[in-house]
């Protein structure tokens, strides 16, 4: 990328956002071209990442570049500008489905070896591990996070409030978390006084030393943590909570983050399934072992593995599983109509999305009968689950929040360089036997941190670098100064890791002019209470948080304030000087794809993409002096405001305006704004004809976009849809397509 040709890299991802991109990219290119801005697409879908991982299994024509690695390299350059859409954080079942689809399309990628026996199978599984979970974000997020609700979006939510369930003081909904034996209880932390190489090893009681991670390079000033979760304590906790829910008649729900925490949380999830169905597992364990059943991947794995059994044997197992429900609590459902429960797949119920949805619904989730019910929300790890209990307490006492009057909670998140738990996957292990787990200096043999562990415990090491902490503090002060809002650092002095952070935050705040700013440090629970008390009075508070709370709170507060987290402006000021603009935080919406394929209606709202693009143009304008880029950003913001005021967002209902119609209206309003502005006459003239054609043909174009709805469509794949077929589905208006081509001609 050069100063002469500023470039915006627009990521091609998965599911609903990918489908929307087929319609939106031609619009973006038509508007960016006159400003001399190049729009480059980069495919980082799960399918593309699988193909990039296995070039040696493909023909020359089938090979694809490793776009994710290239984007990772570009984040280290000062002029990089990336629009990052939500992508699938693949669970094992999703990965297996993507592999099969690619194989069916003629790509000879290897099968996923769930239980590798040979060295080759182990190597293949290791390569596929790079495609699992949140594989994209740690590579691209080379900066801290600045997420906030844009003014136009907040105003719209106040004028057009979304539905909110009522909270009752009599609600039986509550959060259950471990009181001992979890990561919080077993955490140790230190700040390094010099650079070191360390290894992670287990001194087993049997006398042998097992090296789990031979080398982890560390720098001066790094904060490192050692923490473990006891398998015994976790299983006892599940048994107690299931029994309590059964006896009190409250529905049981489990909330983990198996997508991001791709090593630890599937294990945590699997233990819950085994405890719930312990009688069936006790009876059939030998058979399950022979079949390779792994309920860390959910009950769906068990059901698929027993498919090959004779009908009588299969029916007996299913009957035994059903019999377990007689003395277990009712389970929260993902899809009541299809009988899919909370335990079906670890990626179905993700804590950062499921807890806010439950709180928005007045503390209720769906039961097997399709009715909303109070629930015991089980979040085993106490470190962050207590914030949810605090907001539940607040809602029980004060009632539901009111979107028409409530304040806003922007987030400044410590995220850069795989900070904290979200960078721990390659340093997380299921302990093979009892012993002592040590983090040891490779050169000197000095034991830095040590834990007494037992077989089955989950042990992990986390790191946060010094430079991201400095940058995080700087970003928090900057946002406080620009916005005039108070900043609250959500840090618990009783948690060893966060106590180390508090020392650094206090030190680095001295590097900035904080006169007149309200900056405080409080524990998570106190921070939640303080923020809620301000929120309900219409007051705004910036939450400066670590990486996990960044993830949790940028779903929680937007869902309460705006009805969705997809409408947030998410800026990642890259530490090398570039910028990445993430489009919302609401996932990639598989149900939206289902509706498109069945009814040719895409209800995905591209507002997040619109907002990110505006910020991307503005960034180019500021950094390169490109006045037209600034104008594109300014007029796009005005068009977004008009889109919201005129209620032209997608409807959920087939036959009404969908994503394609919403994008048309954005293009029309944007062209109108550019034609009407007086800062650049040449640009105004260039877009006057487009504005005229779109305005005159509004009814025709909307009709062309809606009359195709109501019938099934074929896009030639799910994880790797056919480009031509998807383009035909997503761009059905000949009039609109011709107008865009004419303005580029």
Swiss-Prot record:
A cellular-component GO term for this protein: extracellular region
EC number, UniProt record: 1.1.1.42
pH effect summary: Optimum pH is 7.5. Retains only 10% of activity in acidic pH 5.5 and less than 40% in alkaline pH 9.5.
Activity's thermal dependence: Shows almost similar activity across a wide temperature range (20 degrees Celsius to 40 degrees Celsius). Retains only 5% activity at 60 degrees Celsius.
Positions with a binding annotation for D-threo-isocitrate: 134, 137, 141, 147, 257, 422, 550
UniProtKB keywords: Glyoxylate bypass, Magnesium, Metal-binding, NADP, Oxidoreductase, Tricarboxylic acid cycle
Description of what induces expression: Expressed at the protein level, as evidenced by antibodies present in the sera of patients infected with tuberculosis.
Sites where the protein binds NADP(+): 87, 89, 587-589, 592, 603, 605, 652
Stored NCBIfam families: monomer_idh
Cofactors (names): Mg(2+)
Molecular function as annotated in GO: isocitrate dehydrogenase (NADP+) activity; magnesium ion binding; protein homodimerization activity
Chain residues that bind Mg(2+): 352, 551, 555
InterPro entries assigned to the protein according to its UniProt record, in alphabetical order: Isocitrate_DH_NADP_mono (IPR004436)
Family from the record: Belongs to the monomeric-type IDH family.
Reactions that this protein is recorded to catalyse: D-threo-isocitrate + NADP(+) = 2-oxoglutarate + CO2 + NADPH
GO biological process: glyoxylate cycle; isocitrate metabolic process; tricarboxylic acid cycle
Protein name: Isocitrate dehydrogenase [NADP] 2
Subunit record text: May form homotrimers. Also forms homotetramers at low salt concentration, which are dissociated into homodimers, but not into monomers, at high salt concentration (1 M).
Cofactor stoichiometry and binding remark: Binds 1 Mg(2+) ion per subunit. Shows activity with Mg(2+), but not with Mn(2+), Zn(2+) or Ca(2+).
Cystines in this chain: none
Primary role: Catalyzes the oxidative decarboxylation of isocitrate to 2-oxoglutarate and carbon dioxide with the concomitant reduction of NADP(+). Cannot use NAD(+).
């Amino acid at each position: 990328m050069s100063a002469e040709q500023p470039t915006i890299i627009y990521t091609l991802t998965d599911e609903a956002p990918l489908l929307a991109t087929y319609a939106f990219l031609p619009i973006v290119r038509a508007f960016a071209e006159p400003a001399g801005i190049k729009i480059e697409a980069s495919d980082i879908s799960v399918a593309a990442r699988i193909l990039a991982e296995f070039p040696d299994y493909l023909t020359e024509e089938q090979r694809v570049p490793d776009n994710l690695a290239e984007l990772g390299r570009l984040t280290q350059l000062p002029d990089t500008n990336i629009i990052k859409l939500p992508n699938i954080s693949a669970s094992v079942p999703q990965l297996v489905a993507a592999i099969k689809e690619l194989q069916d399309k003629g790509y000879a990628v290897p099968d996923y070896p769930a239980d590798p026996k040979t060295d080759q199978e182990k190597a293949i599984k290791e390569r596929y591990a790079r495609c699992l979970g949140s594989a994209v974000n740690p590579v691209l997020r080379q900066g801290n996070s600045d997420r906030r609700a844009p003014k136009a979006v907040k105003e719209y939510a106040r004028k057009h409030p979304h539905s909110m369930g009522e909270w009752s003081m009599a609600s039986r909904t509550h959060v259950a978390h471990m009181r001992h034996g979890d990561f919080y209880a077993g955490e140790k932390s230190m700040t390094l006084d010099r650079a070191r190489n360390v290894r992670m090893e287990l001194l087993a009681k049997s006398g042998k030393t097992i090296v789990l991670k031979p080398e982890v390079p560390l720098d001066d000033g790094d904060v490192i943590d050692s923490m473990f979760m006891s398998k015994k304590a976790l299983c006892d906790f599940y048994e107690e909570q299931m029994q309590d829910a059964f006896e009190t008649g409250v529905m049981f729900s489990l909330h983990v983050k198996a997508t991001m925490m791709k090593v630890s949380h599937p294990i945590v999830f699997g233990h819950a399934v085994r405890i719930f169905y312990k009688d069936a597992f006790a009876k059939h364990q030998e058979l399950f072992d022979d079949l390779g059943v792994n309920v860390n991947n959910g009950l769906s794995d068990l059901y698929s593995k027993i498919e090959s059994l004779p009908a009588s044997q299969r029916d007996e197992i299913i009957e035994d599983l059903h019999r377990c429900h007689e003395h277990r609590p009712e389970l929260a459902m993902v899809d009541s109509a299809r009988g899919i429960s909370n335990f079906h797949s670890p990626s179905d119920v993700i804590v950062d999305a499921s807890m806010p949805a439950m709180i928005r619904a007045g503390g209720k989730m769906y039961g097997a009968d399709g009715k909303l019910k109070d629930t015991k929300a089980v979040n085993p790890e106490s470190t962050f689950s207590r914030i949810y209990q605090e907001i539940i307490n607040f809602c029980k006492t004060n009632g539901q929040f009111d979107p028409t009057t409530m304040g806003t909670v922007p987030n400044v998140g410590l995220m850069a360089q795989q900070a904290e738990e979200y960078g721990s996957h390659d340093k997380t292990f299921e302990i093979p036997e009892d012993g002592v787990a040590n983090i040891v200096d490779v050169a000197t043999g000095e034991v830095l941190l040590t834990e007494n562990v037992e077989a089955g415990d989950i042990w992990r090491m986390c790191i946060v670098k010094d430079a991201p902490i400095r940058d995080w503090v700087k970003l928090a002060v900057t946002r406080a100064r620009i916005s005039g809002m108070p900043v609250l650092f959500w840090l618990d002095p009783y948690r060893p890791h966060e106590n180390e952070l508090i020392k650094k935050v206090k030190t680095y705040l001295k590097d900035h002019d904080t006169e007149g700013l309200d900056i405080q440090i409080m524990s998570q629970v106190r921070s939640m209470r303080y923020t809620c008390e301000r929120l309900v009075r219409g007051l705004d508070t910036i939450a400066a948080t670590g990486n996990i709370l960044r993830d949790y709170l940028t779903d929680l507060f937007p869902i309460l304030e705006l009805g969705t987290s997809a409408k947030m402006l998410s800026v990642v000021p890259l530490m090398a000087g570039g910028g990445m603009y993430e489009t919302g935080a609401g996932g990639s919406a598989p149900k939206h794809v289902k509706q498109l394929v069945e009814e040719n209606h895409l209800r995905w709202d591209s507002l997040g993409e619109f907002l990110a693009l505006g910020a991307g143009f503005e960034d180019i304008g500021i950094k390169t002096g490109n006045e037209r880029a600034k104008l594109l950003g300014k007029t796009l913001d005005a068009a977004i405001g008009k889109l919201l005021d005129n209620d032209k967002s997608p409807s959920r209902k087939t036959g009404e305006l969908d994503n394609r119609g919403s994008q048309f209206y954005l293009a029309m309003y944007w062209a109108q704004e550019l034609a009407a502005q007086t800062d650049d006459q040449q640009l105004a003239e260039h877009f006057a004809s487009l504005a005229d054609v779109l305005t005159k043909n509004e009814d025709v174009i909307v009709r062309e976009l809606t009359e195709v709805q109501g019938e099934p469509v074929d896009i030639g794949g799910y994880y790797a849809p056919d480009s031509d077929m998807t383009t035909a589905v997503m761009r059905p208006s000949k009039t609109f397509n011709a107008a865009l081509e004419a303005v580029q001609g």
